[in-house]
């Protein structure tokens, strides 16, 4: 995609309308531009007040394939989100990232061991399942 398209979408991530932010995140994930600016903007959306926006941002990050420690840690944090859909998207995104990075499995396994007594451990197990089953 052209730089102008990416710039326009980045601007829309700050729109006051949640459906606009949501759609812009989805579009950025589909474009596949994993520039630091795009990744940083999507990481910021993981803290959005709207669950559909957090969901789309997590999915987009999983699609971009940037398995940096910052991205992996942010997605692990979403495994404790209050909504199922966001936790599931984070688990799926971690599974996607694990296809290209060997450190994701170890990081998720460590997260599970640290949270084994919490109500969120199942979401960590889902992430690990996505990693192991979809691994190439």
Predicted regions and their residues:
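Amphipathic alpha-helical scaffolding segments comprising HEAT/armadillo-like alpha-solenoid repeats
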Residues: 1-12, 33-46, 66-79, 100-112, ...
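Short inter-helical turns and helix N-cap capping residues of alpha-solenoid HEAT/ARM repeat scaffolds
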Residues: 16-17, 49-50, 82-83, 116-117
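Ankyrin-repeat and related helical/solenoid repeat scaffolds used for protein-protein interactions
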Residues: 84, 88-96, 102-113
């Amino acid at each position: 995609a052209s730089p102008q398209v990416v710039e326009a979408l980045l601007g829309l991530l700050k729109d006051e309308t949640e459906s606009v932010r949501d759609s812009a995140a989805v579009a950025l994930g589909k474009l596949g531009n994993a520039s630091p600016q795009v990744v940083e903007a999507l990481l910021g959306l993981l803290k959005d007040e709207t669950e559909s926006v957090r969901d789309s941002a997590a999915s987009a990050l999983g699609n971009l394939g940037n398995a940096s420690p910052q991205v992996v840690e942010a997605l692990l944090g979403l495994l404790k989100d209050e909504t199922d859909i966001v936790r599931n998207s984070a688990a799926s995104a971690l599974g996607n990232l694990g296809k290209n990075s060997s450190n994701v499995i170890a990081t998720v396994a460590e997260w599970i061991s640290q949270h084994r007594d919490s109500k969120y451990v199942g979401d960590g197990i889902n992430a690990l399942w996505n990693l192991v089953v979809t691994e190439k």
